[in-house]
Amino acid sequence: MELPFAESWKIKMVEPIRKSTRKEREKWIKEAHYNVFQLKAEQVYIDLLTDSGTNAMSDRQWAGMMIGDESYAGATSFFKMKEMINRLTGFEYVLPTHQGRAAENVLFSCLVKEGDYIPGNSHFDTTKGHIESRKAFAVDCTVDEAKNTQLEVPFKGNVDPDKLDKFLSEKADKVPFVIVTITNNTAGGQPVSMKNLRQVRNIANKYHKPVLFDSARFAENAYFIKIREKGYENKTIKEICREMFSYADGMTMSAKKDAVVNMGGFIATNIQDWYDRAKVFGIVYEGYITYGGMNGRDMNAVAIGLDENTEFDNLETRIKQIQYLAQRLDEFNIPYQRPAGGHAIFIDAPKVLTHVPKEEFPAQTLTIELYLEAGIRGCEIGYLLADRDPVTRQNRFGGNDFLRLAIPRRVYTNNHMDVIA
């Protein structure tokens, strides 16, 4: 007999949350200048601002934190984390940082210079920010299918090989590396196929360019490859991860996502020159090379979290909750980026608020209205986040305008999903 689906964990600790009145929320959002980031946590009922660092850790992770080695140099906790990263990725050199954007800052400080171009798939805002703050340019080569939110294709996060090849044929001398974000957050938490990773690798090789992965949600990407890509259905998540990273020369990682911790990140690579140059900036910005802004206890938790969250059952539980919320939204005919992504539901705000012109930022408007109605805090991923063009200073309206509902791992139940829907 096949049992019905149920979560692959049980709950050991809970935290109370409280509802508020609409009158209270109207006062609070006004005091926050209609910026949900300015709200206090206790003013939020269900917090879907991000899945970064907001997850519930496992008992093994908490146990690991109790025996963290806090030595300034050569901490055993660092070597535990490094060994796990080596096993999952094949990357030899590991440089810890306090979170993902710090990893970008350290690595880009030695790789990106004024006038450079960094092609990739829908660079996230911090990635784009670190590129543009150095007077370089982020070039989006995402497949066009990602712009059509109602189109059901399995890998809407892919890099368009033709776009990438054409751009490199014209600007290769100005490109320090190609970046691939797995999963593609800005496009709706959409995965990148293994076939596409191979294509990117081959095109990069053609122009003698290294490939960097923004790997915050690499385990969720591996899950989608196992579920959706022919030939991988019998592979383990760890086997899929190892193959994914074989097509890259390095990675930046926010461990606050798929390592299921509250704080942490790292750079990993097989290019010794990258490591040697990044070490200098790492020491200046983050700390010594065996802690990089992280406590030993946090490095223990990262090592354990990477191991646990590259198991199928853990990922299946997580992604089925996202899919449950998507099914509930379907009942109410709410348009979102289809199919549902790995870490969030991305509501297509202009299709919901058809009367709000793009100049008045539909996704930001919908974000505020959702908070006022139910005390739920989402996040705009769209025209505001895209910022103005650094050269023309005009708003960038070319992409999607989403209200992102990011679901923290192992935090909320499906009853909460019902409230959200």
Listing of model-derived features with the role each one plays in the protein:
Residues 256-257, 359-369, 373-374:
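Phosphate/diphosphate-binding loops
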Residues 309, 385-421:
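PLP-dependent enzyme catalytic core of the Aspartate aminotransferase-like
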Residues 2-34, 40, 44-55, 61, ...:
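Conserved PLP-enzyme active-site core in the AAT-like
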Residues 137-140, 269, 274-277, 297, ...:
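Flexible glycine/proline-rich, aromatic-decorated loop/lid segments
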Residues 262-264, 342, 400-404:
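Short, solvent-exposed beta-strand edge segments and adjacent coil->beta transition regions
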Residues 276, 354-362, 410-419:
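Short, conserved charged micro-motifs
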Residues 192, 346-361, 390-396:
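Short glycine/threonine-rich loop-to-helix capping motif typified by GTGT followed
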Residues 322-323, 337-349:
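Conserved glycine-rich beta-strand-loop-beta hairpin in the small C-terminal domain of fold type I
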